[in-house]
Amino acid sequence: MTEHDKKVYVLDIEAETKNNTNFRTTLWTGEYTQLTVMSIPAGSEIGLEVHGDVDQFLRVEAGAAKLVTGATKEEVADTAELQPDHAVLIPAGTWHNVVNIGDSDLKVYSLYSPAEHAPGTIHKTKEEADAAEALEHGEA
């Protein structure tokens, strides 16, 4: 899969999202926005995280999920169940996690503003993504 950085990019977002088998694939990175698609296996999760200066939009294309959010890492308590066609807007600074509660892969796409990942980022698994993020944050 090739990323289409800073060029007009027309796509079937539902097909791109459902056909993605990687934990995370960056499809497009612009000056102020980034598009990624994710496939989260049954029983797995994105992982509790916060983007200090990045707003995030998530949309579920397939599967079922539980969204958990909170103002601090210790106070994550607000929950919502997500089904296909549900979208979530997560303001910068909000702790959040998306947990796959279904029996099949959860397929979501995400818009970050500004970009959260390096252009062209592909993480085949959550473990690969966690290791890369630990390196980025000097935790490895």
Task: Please describe what each predicted stretch is.
Residues 21, 37-52:
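Conserved short histidine dyad/triad with adjacent acidic residue
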Residues 37, 67-69, 108:
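Short hydrophobic/aromatic-rich beta-strand segments that constitute the beta-sheet cores
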Residues 46-48, 67-68, 90, 96-102:
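Short beta-strand His + acidic residue motifs that chelate non-heme Fe in jelly-roll/DSBH
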Residues 53-71:
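Glycine- and acidic-residue-biased ligand/ion/polar-headgroup-sensing regions
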Residues 57, 103-120:
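A short hydrophobic beta-strand segment most commonly corresponding to one strand
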